[in-house]
Amino acid sequence: MHPAAEDSPLGKSSEYLDTYTPSLLFPIPRAPKWAELGLAAENLPYRGVDVWNCYELSWLLPSGKPVVAVGEFVIPADSPNIVESKSFKLYLNSLNQTVFADREALRQTLARDLSAATGAPVAVRLRSLGEVQEQGVAALPGQCIDELDVTIGRYGQPSAELLRCDPARRVEQVLHSHLLKSNCPVTGQPDWGSLVVDYHGPALDPASLLAYVVSFRQHADFHEQCVERIFLDLLRLLEPGRLTVYARYVRRGGLDINPWRSTGAVVADNRRLARQ
């Protein structure tokens, strides 16, 4: 478990406040998890973002009338901290009985508080329900590998040695799977996700990628670190011309987390999937 997570609200009973309380946000440093992967802030081999979507966001107008919206929060992947998810939920719930002059006043407040907690500029967008409905449900790009006939016997730890490629054949390819699962390192609760691998390089064997994805099934780690581990394992194997790895996780507590890691600039396509 991440040492800082032991002091977070995750896995503990909590009092739900309904008036604005920014101190509820609980930062967790990324550095210890980077160190586990042999990384440090000054030598990250990727660019990226973590996109959080909040479906339980409400506040009051000056008239006392409630408003609801869907919040989108984009956190840089090189920010010093992430925000522990339950503390994020508690913070957002503290807005429920708080008056804001208008939507922009709330957006600025959210951006200020989350930027302070993560140590980096956080972009905030508040979307109306009509906008979200119009956007609809998206399908992942590329080839789905989930129906491949493979025999799998490893579920405990991510196993990079399962991955195989053909160095003699270079391709542009997008593969995806809906079978990503890991466990919260604090509570042990399952984290369900869908994974996309978009690359240019030696042809990755799809069946080996599927076995590798499933090897995370009993692994305990945060969403962000799982995606970073996958990115690094593929980067080492393929030495690709370009590589983007991202996952869209099923929401819990009204929040879903969607980490993107890439060798190039990231433009996150933040459209929800059927399970989100």
Swiss-Prot record:
It is found in: Cytoplasm. The active site is at C184 (thioimide intermediate), D191 (proton donor). Pathway: tRNA modification; tRNA-queuosine biosynthesis. Substrate binds at V83, E84, S85, H223, E224. Its EC number is 1.7.1.13. GO terms for molecular function: preQ1 synthase activity. PANTHER family: NADPH-DEPENDENT 7-CYANO-7-DEAZAGUANINE REDUCTASE. Belongs to the GTP cyclohydrolase I family. QueF type 2 subfamily. Homodimer. HAMAP family: QueF_type2. This is NADPH-dependent 7-cyano-7-deazaguanine reductase. The lineage of its organism: Bacteria, Pseudomonadati, Pseudomonadota, Gammaproteobacteria, Pseudomonadales. The gene is queF.
